């Protein structure tokens, strides 16, 4: 299913950008060093919240993709559960609709 693969790739790229940019949101008095896009252990709430949200979003969308692939492997093509899972995936892409890589077919 190329449409699922393209959407997963698009979301993965956006989340990778967010993970990289999370390091920009440390508080001014943060003693922790920032190393190559990774957030060190510190008490700044914003980077940790961004990284936690991205990890949760990845997990949910990965579960949706696995459901679609599993049903496709069993010969079910776009069952109700697959359609619902794909709608969830498209909802996660909606905040990025202004990105040049956005495809209108991803609108929920």
Spans of features found by a protein language model:
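Functionally engaged cysteine thiol sites
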Residues: 26, 30-33, 42-44, 79, ...
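Aromatic-glycine hotspot motif
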Residues: 1-35, 54, 58
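Amphipathic alpha-helical oligomerization segments
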Residues: 17-24, 45-80
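Flexible loop/turn and low-complexity linker elements, especially glycine-anchored beta turns
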Residues: 2-10, 41-62, 85-108
